[in-house]
C-alpha cells in the first residue's frame, strides 16, 4: 500500500468575501461598502489631516524597505481613533497608550478596527486578598 502524503492547505484571508490582493486594489468607495456600519460612517465623513499624514508616513516607511522580509520602520502615533485600512497591512505602528508606545504589526485580520483596540490604556486589575473591614465577617479574622 502506498500512502499518499496530504499537503496542508491554508485558508486564504478574505474580508467580506474579497481576497486580500483584491482589497489592496479597491477604490475607496468600494472598500467603504465592504466595511461595517460604524467604519463606513467614519470613512464617509471628512478624514482629519492627522490621519492622512499618518497614512503618508506608513506608505513612506513601507517604500523605504530595501530587503525582502525586512519590516518597515516604526511609525508612531497618539491617535487611537485611526481606522485600519488594507493599505496599512504590513506596517509597524507605535500606538500611544498614555505611558508608552506599543508596537503593533498590522495584519489583515485588523482591517476595520481602530488603532486604540490594539494598545490598551489600562492594566487589568489583579485583586489581592481582602483586608480588615472588607466584610462584616472579616472582623473575626486574625491580623496575620
Curated annotation (Swiss-Prot):
Q: Which Gene3D superfamilies does UniProt cross-reference here? A: 30s Ribosomal Protein S19, Chain A
Please report a single Pfam family linked to this protein.
Ribosomal_S19
Query: Which residues constitute the signal peptide according to the record?
Result: none
> Which GO biological process annotations does it have?
ribosomal small subunit assembly; translation
Query: A single GO CC term, please?
Result: cytosolic small ribosomal subunit
Q: Which SUPFAM superfamilies match?
A: Ribosomal protein S19
Q: Where does the source fall among the domains of life?
A: Eukaryota
Keyword annotations: Ribonucleoprotein, Ribosomal protein
Q: Which GO terms describe its molecular function?
A: structural constituent of ribosome
Instruction: Provide the family line.
Output: Belongs to the universal ribosomal protein uS19 family.
Q: Which PANTHER family match?
A: RIBOSOMAL PROTEIN S19P FAMILY MEMBER (PTHR11880), SMALL RIBOSOMAL SUBUNIT PROTEIN US19 (PTHR11880:SF2)
UniProt name for this protein: Small ribosomal subunit protein uS19
Amino acid at each position: 500500500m502506498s500512502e499518499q502524503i496530504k499537503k496542508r492547505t491554508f485558508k486564504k484571508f478574505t474580508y467580506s468575501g474579497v481576497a486580500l490582493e483584491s482589497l489592496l486594489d479597491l477604490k475607496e468607495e468600494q472598500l467603504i461598502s465592504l466595511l461595517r456600519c460604524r467604519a463606513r460612517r467614519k470613512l464617509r465623513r471628512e478624514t482629519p489631516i492627522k490621519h492622512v499624514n499618518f497614512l503618508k508616513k506608513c506608505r513612506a516607511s513601507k517604500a523605504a524597505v530595501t530587503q525582502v522580509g525586512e519590516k518597515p520602520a516604526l511609525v508612531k502615533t497618539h491617535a487611537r481613533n485611526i481606522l485600519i485600512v488594507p493599505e496599512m497591512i504590513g506596517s509597524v505602528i507605535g500606538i500611544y497608550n498614555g505611558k508608552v508606545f506599543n508596537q503593533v504589526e498590522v495584519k489583515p485580520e485588523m482591517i476595520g478596527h481602530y488603532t486604540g483596540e490594539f494598545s490598551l490604556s489600562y492594566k487589568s486589575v489583579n485583586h489581592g486578598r481582602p483586608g480588615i473591614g472588607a466584610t462584616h465577617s472579616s472582623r473575626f479574622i486574625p491580623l496575620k
